[in-house]
Regions:
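S-adenosyl-L-methionine-dependent methyltransferase catalytic core, i.e., the SAM/SAH-binding region
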Residues: 1-316
Length: 316
């Protein structure tokens, strides 16, 4: 079962990336192709859209898009960190790179893949169904301390210790096989008043387990330098994040590249020789309008940051 895909901050992405006829743009997280389609429509027959996704179901959607747009297209089935590194290694240069981070709507809405706490399904949560590690293994084999750390660090879950302890106790009786079974354990571990505050009680735990299964933060840490190295001088990067762990990484990365001289303020002449290699394209993260959130509630937590590359300063 799937719902119609609605790309988040679609107009804002186009405004900041400014794709032009004849350019090369990389969509590092193709998903359902909503952003890619709008970008491709601006590239014209001489432009090139390179789409990346590790989910095999995305490739069929890409084939449909490729048959309908006039620009040249290329699909790479891989995680975006590895694909971007490979593109840099082969000497590809891009005028724009987009990373729409986190889980795609089509993955959430394919209930049997186990990403959602709202529907019963096998515990899976793999973006690439071919990888070995899945949510069932995390929940049923990782020790209590490791589970608590994952819940605390990747989900910013206040009750990480209580939930981890409850998971271990529950699996001693029988393995946790389904999303509903995990949800019930989480609910029982949280104090009653907290179950009705701040959204679904399993939201943060599911986020943490999904991030751990897919190595999402490690992927992002590898991908950002490669995405930047891929850009030509004057090229533009845009990143959409959906939680603070991602947003902080994107913010720090772009701010570091937009920073010029780092000498002490009392030094009369610059000694470091450092100049900015990026210009931030918005002072703060761009957020969805109330109208977009009303039309697409999943957009509520989205944050968009973008920068233009001023010079080829490398990836470090």
């Amino acid at each position: 079962m799937t719902r119609p895909h609605v790309p988040v901050l679609a107009d804002e992405v186009l405004d900041l990336l400014e794709p032009q006829p004849g350019e090369t743009v990389v969509d590092g997280t193709f998903g359902a192709g909503g952003h890619a389609r709008r970008i491709a429509e601006r590239l014209g027959p001489d432009g090139l859209l390179i789409a990346i996704d590790r989910d095999p179901t995305a490739e069929a959607r890409f084939d449909e898009l490729a048959a309908e747009v006039s620009c040249r297209t290329r699909f790479i089935r891989a995680d975006f960190a590895s694909a971007l590194e490979d593109l840099v290694a082969e000497g590809t240069r891009a005028d724009g790179v987009l990373l729409d981070l986190g889980i795609s709507s089509m993955q959430v809405d394919t209930f049997e893949r186990g990403f959602s706490y709202s529907y019963d399904a096998p515990l899976d949560m793999r973006m690439d169904p071919g990888q070995e590690l899945d949510a069932r293994e995390v929940v049923n084999t990782w020790d209590e301390r490791r589970l608590a750390r994952v819940l605390r660090e990747l989900g910013e879950e206040r009750y990480a210790k209580q939930i981890a302890r409850a998971i271990v106790r529950a699996r001693e009786q029988r393995p946790l096989e389904t999303t509903n079974a995990l949800v019930e354990v989480i609910k029982d571990a949280i104090p009653a008043p907290a179950r009705f505050a701040g959204g679904h009680p399993a939201k943060r735990a599911f986020q943490a387990i999904r991030i751990a299964v897919n190595g999402e933060l490690e992927q992002l840490d590898r991908a950002l330098p490669s995405a930047w190295a891929l850009l030509r001088e004057g090229g533009r990067f845009a990143g959409i994040s959906f939680h603070s762990l991602e947003d902080r990484r994107v913010k720090r990365f772009l701010a570091d590249r937009a920073r010029g001289c780092i000498c002490p303020p009392d030094l009369p002449v610059c000694a470091c020789g450092r100049t900015a290699e990026a210009a931030l394209l918005s002072r703060r993260a761009v957020q969805p309008t109330p109208e977009e959130i009303a039309d697409n509630p999943r957009a509520a937590s989205a944050r968009l940051r973008a920068a233009r590359k001023l010079r080829d300063g490398g990836s470090a």
